[in-house]
Amino acid sequence: MGILTYDNLKVGNTPLLRLSNLENGELKIYAKLEWMNPFGSIKDRAAYWMIKIAEKEGLLSKDKKIIEPTSGNTGIALACISRALGYKFYAVVPQAITDETKILIKKLGGEVFETPDDLCPRFGKGTDQSIALAKSIVESYPDQYFMPNQYENEANFLAHYESTGPEIWKATEGKVTHLISGIGTGGTITGAGLYLKEQGNIEIIGVEPQKNHHIQGLRNFEESGIPPILSKRIKIIDRWIKVSDEEAFTAVRLAAEKEGLLIGPSSGAVLAAALKLNKEHIKGTAVLIFADDAVKYLGLYTKLGVLNSEQLDILRKLSNALSF
């Protein structure tokens, strides 16, 4: 690629893949493979837009360091972009995220601060400590730090309104009838969802995990505060589908066995929701947001027995390629 600039950073335009082996009726199921973004997840979009707009508006300059609360993928994307553009990056993360995620952020030049938090709850009800810590640092040293704040930054919403939504509409030739997405900050489902609703009668479905879940990147809103990005446009969501850990990890296994896809836990939760929808004998075309693949979850999948030995061997080779 050469020197990284905003002009040659190819974020977006990820493919749609039909999951025909998982269809069971008249609902066509397509997955948007967001791990095909340059830094491996859907969060590349928000990170790219937040930094680009911050520089353009003069909120971020080379004398500042970037700090962000993240459950993983935004931190990875920001670490990559920060390193390429010459910024120092600090990720404030929940202790519960996978070791692979923490290691990768560090290998990309970022520093990691851990908090017990409900961004990926495993310790009971939290108080969004990662967000609170990052905000307190910025408030104490406003001349030294810039926090993109994916939970409130309109650039997060715009990234999906301007890219993800239009890509889905174009790729399906306007035939999409359902959008199914997990929710972390709410940027994806509100941005892509609003765009699609403006085009036609599209049902927007939000996926919510169980309490005390193990699905990195998603939120249970009985445990966690509703991010401002989501709260101001929450009515865009027509329906919520609850998914348990067992359902999500069963869907991860199905994706591997039936489609040869090694997907992350949040993608498994989204697939589980689609399979529930499929049982309702609905006609149409559903697009699922697969936020990332399984490469950062080798330890978790091994511990929980999510994949078989052959699948884990493939995943281990992918992880080794990233030097975890």
Explain the meaning of each model-derived region.
Residues M1-F324:
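PLP-dependent amino-acid enzyme catalytic core
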